A protein has these predicted regions:
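Cell wall/extracellular polymer interaction/catalysis modules
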Residues: 1-162, 173-185, 189-190
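Short cysteine clusters
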Residues: 165
């Protein structure tokens, strides 16, 4: 019953978020979500239909939103828990990571740090992962070296390229999060 009350204050979900490359710059895009048109950063290698681990490209794909990780902050120094219909988990500094070692059984999964194989920390100092939406690229049926940690996250000022993720300004993430649900699909177009 309380879940319904919480959801009653959230707006209608957006089922499709389209991401198109910006003309003249393969590393930037325009994200279209319902009435919103938002600039975004894409991978340093642009987009690709042949995604490989470490190639720096954003996959051309239809990806479901799975869950949100957020940094939070007792002192208010980080973004608060986003309002969203997606499950949300708070990042624990020094504990939460994401495996990017293609040969490890935990490849492209949340892991606890320290981790014996290669893994990136979710508690970054640069604030890019203050809010992270996990996308289902190579997630449900993982294939070695097909790419890991393809997230929808916060962009650096000026929208420099990512390592393959989709990134928006913090204010735009706050604006979009309430519209996200498990049925939301991020569609990266050619």
């Amino acid at each position: 019953m309380q879940k319904r009350k919480a959801f009653a204050t959230l707006p209608v979900t957006i089922n499709r978020i389209s991401i198109r490359r910006k003309p003249g710059d393969d590393r930037r895009g325009i994200l279209a979500a319902g009435p919103f048109r938002i600039p975004c950063a894409l991978g340093r290698s642009g987009t690709t239909i042949f995604k490989r681990e470490g190639d720096g490209a954003t996959p051309v794909a239809v990806m479901a939103a799975i869950e949100i990780w957020y940094r939070g902050g007792a002192r208010g120094d980080r973004m608060a828990r986003p309002k969203s219909r997606l499950p949300a988990r708070r990042v624990r500094p020094g504990v939460d990571g994401w495996c990017d070692a293609p040969r490890h059984a935990a490849y492209n999964r949340h892991v606890r740090l320290p981790f014996p194989a290669s893994a990136e920390t979710l508690a970054r100092d640069d604030r890019l992962y203050d809010v992270v939406v996990v996308l289902d690229w190579n997630y449900r049926r993982r294939a070695r070296s097909r790419g890991s940690a393809i997230f929808f996250h916060v962009a650096r000022p000026g929208y420099p390229p990512t390592e393959g993720c989709i990134a928006v300004a913090p204010s735009d993430m706050t604006k979009l999060a309430p519209f996200l649900a498990r049925r939301t699909r991020l569609v990266v177009e050619r």
